[in-house]
Amino acid sequence: MAEAIDIRELNIRIEQQSAFVTNLVSGMDRVIVGQKHLVDSLLIGLLSDGHILLEGVPGLAKTLAIKTLSQLIDADYSRIQFTPDLLPADVIGTMIYSQKDEKFQVKKGPVFANFVLADEINRAPAKVQSALLEAMQEKQVTIGSETFQLPNPFLVMATQNPIEQEGTYPLPEAQVDRFMLKVVIDYPSLDEEKKIIRENIAGEMPEVTPVTTAEAILRARSVVREVYIDEKIEQYIADIVFATRYPDRYALKDLKDMISFGGSPRASINLAKAARAYAFIKRRGYVVPEDVRAVAHDVLRHRIGLTYEAEASNITSEEIVSKIINKVEVP
């Protein structure tokens, strides 16, 4: 009974702390036509302190989405265009000698912002990618002999173009695993496309004004961490991730030859975190199986390695995740 009272009290607090979510979503909807899944994913990443890898062809409002979100929160935004000649110092910053003061001064790089768009992350060499990924993991950057904390909240949205893969530096599996979500975005619907044409021809880009603050986001994060996950839901999350490693244990023998490696414990942690954030967005103080299923594809698609057999059969990690969540017993 005490637990029920706690949940009730938590629901009231969630109702209070999540009021800004409606304002954020409506603010995004005024600027971004369609792409609801992209907006939801950005909110999940923001509320659960996770980073997002976005895959989609150019022109699908990836840059506009994160820029609009930063304006709605009145936060700093920066964009890094990854190119083959980029250096780690171009991302994190460097020491510059000042002749006037006769000493070295720190010049901070574009990574020092609340929202960082790493555009076409697979266009830059591995040492540049790892400089950004280290900053993402540690939430701090070392320039010279000094260590600097990155702003809070700190959200990186990296993009990849799935078509032009020539001359790129694909992210290693260990690096990809650091992204909480990998979101694949698709073209808008026919009606959405017509609306985009109308708005752009009219030249009416709505003005974006802040609807919340970075402090409100940090308060909301602490409430998200309190969202209740029952033991049965924990078991459900663990079963889904274990099914990516040992499919034959879950009557999925046909997947055994398709998967070269499954999700790490980081997959389980991120699945739980994302499900909590999703429950918060839905104004609930507890996680239900539907929350887990809603975020499973985005959390797991980049954490499953495919065998040559799977690739030859045109089986995608997307299909594997779908088979797993349809087979694993729901509590």
Language-model features, listed with the residues they occupy:
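Conserved C-terminal "switch" segment of AAA+ ATPases
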Residues: L10-S18, V31, T168, K182-D254, ...
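Pre-Walker A (pre-P-loop) alpha-helix and adjacent loop at the N terminus of AAA/AAA+ ATPase modules
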Residues: R13-L60, F242
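C-terminal engagement/docking regions of AAA+ P-loop ATPases
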Residues: M1-E15, P247-P331
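Walker B catalytic acidic pair
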Residues: G56, D119-E120, A131
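Conserved alpha-helical scaffold flanking the Walker A/P-loop in AAA+ ATPase domains
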Residues: S41-I44, Y97-L117, E146
